[in-house]
Amino acid sequence: CESGGEVVVEITVNRAGEVTAARVRSGGDACMREMAERAARNSLFNIDDSAPARQTGTITYIFIPQ
């Protein structure tokens, strides 16, 4: 990705800290959107057996022009 910008990805995380769903909510060109969604799907969070079965949130990725 050669351009810069911001991409917001909505994620769903299970109790094991795994991202079970990710989709781009806004921003970026096709390259940035693909890279941000891939990075979100590969993210891991803390395991919490007492957490809700599913939690949702967003991750904002900021791309710097290269």
Predicted regions located by residue number:
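Short tight loops/turns at secondary-structure junctions
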Residues: C1-G28, A40
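Short, positively biased Gly/Pro-containing turn/loop motifs at secondary-structure boundaries
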Residues: E37-Q66
